[in-house]
């Protein structure tokens, strides 16, 4: 606060408990206003707000200073994708001249032009066909009079998933989905089923799309001396953290999510699914014995604040509970931290003995926020986190690819 006041900026926050509304008054000193208006430009002040439940949000207070007809403004972070963006500017004086933006790859000589859309005093233009991970510059123009402010942005990277073809494996009971000495991205429930001397997710060279292997996820009754529990074959981005024993049954603790900042529009890959009849329902309210089992794949991008277990912080921590499923800490598909989400259920076996292509569109709930993590989960029994499904239900996965527009 002292540094802000020294620069000429002061503020006062108030919270009305009756209306449950907070307000902030920001005051600019005469010296700061003189400095801001000394040359054409836009100044952005980022405002952070935190509520009593420690949930945060932020907004931008944008101040424009210009004696020109139009002023180029910085793009909004969420408007920059891999191959498209929204340019922004402001109308400072009324004019009958046509309003456009000029843009180009930084360092090139040729400008492209696009017509601006005027909404009140705000100018915007959506541009497409941009190059991935490339820096562009742009300027707002009225007639032939261009703003003296040139702004820049860099398109997103089209990041892909490590070991997306499921070619790298090592170990047995548990089997790991990465090479020995390598870096883990994917993990499985093999750490839990190993106590019963079995793996539920393995490499398979007999069913595949490309390369040498696919990932084979098989639902099993993992038991020792006849005592055990149903376990769904699964693979997820993250890490299996622990098995907490409750008598003779085990409850898994999983850290879901890996760092990720790009925004794909879909997850594409290849799958074969064999659905068996549900023979364990563990009182699950979503599926009954005798029903056909359901396979599931979902992708989530979000900016979760993170949860800590064993000294490690993960975007999401999942805790299953065999005896009292209602007390489990399962994934919340309605979380406010989810930015983009897509899922696909397989309610019956896929046709034939080979793999078929699947495509899961990602629907973005927010476009003004960027993700910090990606969660991808696949299961041979959708309700495996309730210890419910059909033994023998099997899902093969291969050649995952993130699709970008």
Regions found by a protein language model. Give the residues of each.
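Low-complexity "stalk/linker" and mucin-like segments enriched in Ser/Thr/Pro/Ala/Gly
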Residues: 2-30, 107-117
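C-terminal edge beta-strand
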Residues: 56-68, 148-156
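Proline-enriched interdomain boundary motifs that mark the N-terminal boundary
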Residues: 68-75
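Extracellular/luminal low-complexity segments enriched in Ser/Thr/Pro
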Residues: 30-40
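Short, flexible loop/turn segments at beta-strand junctions in immunoglobulin-like
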Residues: 36-37, 126-131, 364
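Aromatic (Trp/Tyr/Phe) and Gly/Pro-enriched flexible surface segments
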Residues: 152-264, 290-296, 300-302, 308-382, ...
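Conserved structural position at the C-terminal beta-strand
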Residues: 49, 140-142
């Amino acid at each position: 606060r002292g540094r802000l006041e020294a620069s000429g900026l002061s503020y006062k926050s108030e919270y009305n408990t009756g209306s449950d509304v907070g307000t902030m008054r920001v005051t600019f000193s005469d010296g700061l206003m003189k400095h801001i208006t000394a040359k054409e430009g836009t100044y952005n002040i980022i405002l952070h707000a935190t509520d009593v439940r420690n949930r945060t949000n932020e907004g931008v207070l944008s101040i424009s200073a210009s004696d020109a007809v139009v002023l180029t403004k910085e793009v909004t972070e969420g408007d920059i994708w891999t191959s498209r963006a929204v340019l922004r500017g402001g109308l400072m004086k009324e004019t009958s001249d046509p309003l456009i933006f000029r843009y180009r790859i930084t360092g090139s000589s040729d400008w492209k032009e696009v017509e601006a859309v005027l909404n009140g005093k705000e100018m915007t233009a959506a541009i497409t066909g941009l190059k991935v991970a490339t820096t562009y510059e742009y300027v707002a123009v009225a007639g032939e009079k261009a703003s003296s402010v040139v702004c820049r942005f860099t398109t997103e990277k089209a990041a892909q998933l490590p070991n997306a073809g499921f070619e790298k494996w090592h170990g047995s009971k548990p089997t790991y989905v990465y090479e020995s000495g390598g870096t883990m991205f994917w993990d499985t429930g093999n750490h839990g089923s190993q106590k019963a001397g079995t793996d539920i997710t393995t490499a398979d060279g007999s069913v595949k799309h490309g390369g040498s292997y696919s990932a084979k996820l098989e639902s099993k009754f993992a038991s020792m001396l006849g005592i055990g529990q149903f376990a769904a074959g699964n693979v997820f981005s993250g890490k299996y953290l622990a098995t907490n024993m409750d008598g003779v049954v085990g409850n898994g603790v999983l850290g879901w999510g890996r760092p990720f900042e790009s925004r794909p529009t879909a997850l594409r890959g290849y799958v074969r699914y064999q659905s068996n009849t549900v023979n364990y329902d563990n009182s699950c309210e979503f599926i009954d014995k005798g029903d056909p089992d359901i396979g599931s794949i979902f992708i989530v991008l979000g900016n979760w604040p993170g949860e800590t277990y064993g000294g490690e912080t993960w975007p999401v921590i999942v805790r299953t509970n065999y005896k009292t499923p209602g007390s489990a800490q399962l994934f919340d598909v309605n979380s406010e931290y989810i930015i983009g989400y897509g899922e696909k259920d397989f309610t019956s076996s896929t046709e034939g003995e080979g793999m078929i292509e699947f495509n899961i569109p990602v629907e973005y709930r927010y476009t003004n926020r960027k993700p910090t993590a990606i969660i991808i989960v696949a299961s041979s029994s959708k309700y495996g986190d309730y210890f419910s499904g059909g033994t023998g239900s099997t899902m093969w996965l291969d050649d995952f690819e993130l699709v970008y527009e």
